[in-house]
Curated annotation (Swiss-Prot):
It is found in: Nucleus. One of its GO terms (molecular function) is pre-mRNA 3'-splice site binding. Residues 1-42, 195-231, 481-548, 555-574 are annotated as: Disordered. A zinc finger (CCHC-type) spans 100-117. Associated with the spliceosome. Belongs to the SLU7 family. Residues 204-223 have a biased composition (Acidic residues). Involved in pre-mRNA splicing. It comes from Cryptococcus neoformans var. neoformans serotype D (strain JEC21 / ATCC MYA-565). GO terms for cellular component: spliceosomal complex. This is Pre-mRNA-splicing factor SLU7.
Amino acid sequence: MLSTSTSLQGGKVSREEYRRQKDLEAARKAGTAPAALDEQGNAINPHIPEYITKAPWYADTGRPSLAHQRINEQGPHLKLDEWYDRGAKAGPAAKKYRKGACENCGAMTHKMKDCVERPRKRGAKFTNKDIAPDELVQQFEGDYDAKRDRWNGYDPASYKHVVEEYEATEQMRKKYREEEIDQQTSTDMAVVKKLAKKDKEGKVEDDDDDFGSSDEDEDDEDKYADAADQVGQKLDTKTRITVRNLRIREDTAKYLINLDESSAYYDPKTRSMRDAPVRNMNPEDMKFAGDNFQRYSGDATNMQKLQLFAWQSAQKGSNINVSANPTAGELLHREFQQKKEVLKDTNKTSILAKYGGEEHLQRMPNELLSGQTENYVEYSRSGQIIKGRERAKARSKYDEDVYINNHTAIWGSYYDLSTSQWGFACCHSVLPGSYCTGDAGKLANAASSASALLASSNERSKIEEAAEKERESLAEQHLKDLASGKAKKGKEREWDLPQYAKRREDGEELDLDKGRLKNALKEEKKRKKMGEDEAWQQTKKGKTDVTQEELEAYRLSRQAYDDPMSNYQDPEDQ
């Protein structure tokens, strides 16, 4: 409904104001109060809902209006003959180069990078010669459709040359056809004899113009016949094919075979005639014997069986409807057929088991009855069927389930991956004619395998290396002792130098200087009290090598979270 200016502006309305608005709306609907006016002074229908008359917040003007529901007026459209005048010049060319003009051609309407002329060796800016005139710049502000119209600005007069070319081709085609027919007529002996005979007998033209024409008229018409070969086309007009769905007029329609009203009925809607149009006639001698044969072709018979099954089931109380649920009916019918076949086989088996006579039902193969067959069968050298109607199943050439030479498994029950050979699973033997050796044979084959031989060769090489070390000469041992003695003396002389850190072996004790260790502990505590940035700056300024004492100080001062005494502090250190 329409609202007042207070409600349009979004202010809170009191009860009295809200009641006054409702009364005004009711009066406007009843016609006792004048209707509201919009910005243009037009009356607004009071029956229009409020959600239509109320403008959104971004288009609200504070007054009731329907301007937001109307389409904005569009500007004038471009005319058909109003378009860019391509290649038009604004005036004569200048004589001197002007400041701000194109450096290449000298025009004022574009810059050098947008110039479409060939780049000159020396531009017009430096030569003041051959200055191009200014182009005529036109501005057209078209609407959305005008900017996207592919035919906007197209000149229909430009298609005139296509029409002229087609007319010239058509004239040449007619002229070529006339010359071809004239040449063919002059050389045709049959036409010459016919004309001579006609002149000799002195016959006049027939007066059957309404039903035909003379040969001369036909010859003249052939000159302009549409069936003539056209120049520039590969289509042979003499061998045109008619449309496939057009019936050839040589055959007779089924409803025209017998015009007797009491004959077979023809249904024009389905174009079908079920019965034969001519009675008392052999169907084999008839060209058309009716469309009833189609009722027994395809799935028509199966559909009749399905419908019969549905009717019989409905009589017995089953709710089967082929039209309402054809899928369920098809599934039930298929299940019924399967059960029927099973029951038929069961009855046959029980009767044969009770009364006998199964041997009389067995039939000899066709090969034995006729003595020969046309079925192609191809056999292998071992007598197996390779190709034919009855292909035998693939079977092994070895005797199955035959245990030889005390084996408990057949040949081929084991496959050795290392040697890619088949064998017996009971003893892992890969020889077909070997005797079974049981678990001892498995161990022997495992020991003689390639992996076991490689492992034994590795152990042998290790033993040889150990023996080689034991065979070192006394001279080499003496040289090593001398070298170790010099190293010890060097260590005594270098006792005052710092010992750099190395990995401690298991059970090895390091000789640490107590004074250096104490100083390292103080430095480590001082480093931990520093901030992160300050410690990083101090680390960059210091040395990069770590001594054994510094490493030991780090280990001693490192906090162990799983140590119950990690938080204990000596009173002397506090």
